[in-house]
Every structure is written in C-alpha cells, then in structure tokens.
Curated annotation (Swiss-Prot):
Broadest EC class assigned to this enzyme: oxidoreductase
Keyword tags: Dioxygenase, Iron, Metal-binding, Oxidoreductase
E.C. no: 1.14.11.-
Keyword Transcription regulation appears in the UniProt entry: no
UniProt entry tagged with the keyword Nuclease: no
Applied uses, from the record: Being totally regio- and stereoselective, this enzyme is of interest for biocatalytic purposes to produce chiral scaffolds that are of synthetic value in the preparation of more complex functionalized chiral molecules such as natural products and analogs.
Family indicated by similarity: Belongs to the clavaminate synthase family.
InterPro entries reported for this sequence: TauD-like_sf (IPR042098)
Cofactor field: Fe(2+)
Residues given in the record as Fe cation binding sites: H182, E184, H318
Organism: Chitinophaga pinensis (strain ATCC 43595 / DSM 2588 / LMG 13176 / NBRC 15968 / NCIMB 11800 / UQM 2034)
GO molecular function, one term: metal ion binding
Protein name: L-lysine 4-hydroxylase
Amino acid sequence: MRPLDVTPTISPGAQDLPRTMHFAAEPPLQPLIIDITEEEKLEITYIGKKLKRKYKSYDDPGFISMLHLNAYTLLPERIAKVLSNFGTDFSDQQYGAVVLRGLIEIGQDELGPTPRSWQETDHEKIMEYGFISSLLHGAVPSKPVEYFAQRKGGGLMHAIIPDENMSFTQTGSGSRTDLFVHTEDAFLHNAADFLSFLFLRNEERVPSTLYSIRSHGRPDAILQELFKPIYKCPKDANYASEEALGDDIRTSVLYGSRSAPFMRFDAAEQIYNEDANQDPEALHNLKRFWEEARKLIYNDFVPESGDLIFVNNHLCAHGRNAFLAGFREENGQLVKCERRLMLRMMSKTSLINIREVTHPENPYLIMEEHYGKVYSAHLANL
C-alpha cells in the first residue's frame, strides 16, 4: 500500500467544496473524511426519531415520495451540500467515497445484542437509522432501491451481520477471510449507483477497505485493456455454484470516459473464482490490473459506532479485513465483545432508466438476475 501522510478532512463548520477550487495533480488515494459536529449529530439523531414517529417505516410510500424534499429540508445544510456535490462529481480527482465520521449517536442498550444472522434482525430497533440513511441518498439525489438478487429484495436497507455458518464466504455475512474489494453486484448491468454503510457496531475494530479506480491516475495501457468487453463475472457466493455461473456473458470492467472511467469489478469472482472460466486474454489482463490495484487499496480507516461511509459504486470498490466475530484484541489478548453490525442501503439516480428490469408493481424492486436477464415477477411476494 502506498504510504499516506495526511487524511483529508473537512473540519467542523466548513461548508461545501467550491466547484472552482484547484486540485493537485496527484490522483486521490483515500476518501474524504468529514467530522460531524456535535450539533449536527444531535440534529440528525433527532430527525431519525422524529421521522420514525411520523411515518413508522422508512419504506412508507409517503416518506419515499417526499424523500428529496425532506433531505434538503431536514438534513444539516453542510452535509446536504457535500452529498449533492458528490453525486455529480465524476472528475479525475473524485475518489468516490466520503466518510461521515460520528454522524449519529447509536443507542447501544436499545439496540440489544447483535442477532446471530441478518434473518433474525429486529427491524423496529434499526428503523430510525433507515430514515437517516434514506435522507443521505435523497440528498445526492438518488432513490433507495432493493434487489431481488439480494435476499429476494429484503427491504430498502439490509443488516450486515457476521454469520458463523457463512464465516469463510466472500459475502457480507463472512468474517474469517478478507472480503476482496468489489463494486456491489458487479454481475448486473443495473447495479446500485450509490451505497451507504452505517456502522452501528464495530467492536472488533475491523478496518474497512476501499479501492478507487481514480487512484491510478490517467488510465495506462494496462487499464485500457479493461475497456474490452471480454470479461465474465459470475454471481457471488450467495448462490449455489451452478446457479452462480449464470449466462456466458462478457462485459468490460471499465466503461464511460476513457480518461476518467467508471468501473464494474469483483476481484473474488473475476480473478480468484476458477469457475468463472475467463478466457486467457481476459484473465491475463485482470491479473496485471490486480497487481497494480491491490497496491492502491486503502484500509487505514477503522469505523466506530455512528460512522457512515457513502460510496459511488461506479468509482469505488469496497471490502473489509478478516476478523474473528465477537472478539477484539486488547494487549495481545482476545476479549469477548458484541459482534459487528452494519446497515447497507443502495440507491439509483433514475427509476426511469431501470424500468424494464424492475417489478411491474414496484419500481423500487430491481428484478435483474445476471447481466440483463430478469427474474420472473411472480417470484416476488408483494
């Protein structure tokens, strides 16, 4: 990993980033980290509780239909401006991730013990955090969505919890192996535009890993090869092996601007999964790319309770280090602790552009299965 000197931050009270400011020529190597003030934290915490009392659930149609207005009306102005700028900045200096450090006060006693798996989540206990996450996406502006390919929808927000039965998998439920960096749902044409990861607990002190395509600078000859539509990507480890392979479709890893491209990439599935059966040229190109990319992975940020990472899924891949769930190290000794608990939300900037792959009765439920192939609508119990 390239040595880092100073973590970029916006100090408390600073306003939005001016569009005309001049950036250094060096490519960005780490996310912007914004320290939330105590006043902002109290305001956001209050907003979450207030919206829960009014709407009961963050997927209430009345709340979702007013999401963007609520975001600009209710969020602290500084945070709304940062996210609004973030949503339209695809420049060569945009890393593609923003950390909102100390965003919200998490009531640990009210939260109770971490469930054994996401299936046992008590959604009532995390409801107010769903409202807050939704508002942040609304400020981009972007609309929260759910994917049938993940938990058969499962709602607009997913609890990410280490599951002992899946501890060695390349999924959010894993823990005992490094989760390789990946853009979310790289096997879909209509993957999320933006992601948020709200950490309710990270007592094991697990670093989050981020990797931005912008960290390479202007694409060299190795990266230019990734514009070729020759790369396969199976579905992830949530699927049985035969089902995961899907159709034999090839796409590019990089797309969009040749000088400042977007990325669709999953290291685990495209490089380390032998069942992907990449063509020799494709695998050669991916391995050369990975040798460069892995040196640019940023994992110096250890989230604490109440921190949130906001990600542009077209620019920045995410993952995490391996850890032993329910234990942290203190003075060389393993000490028992509550297991990690994180909340993920995904969003799209346009429901119109994805309408052919969304459920006929629910434009927020994306039914894409694998690179344009769509699940039958009758599978979803609405």
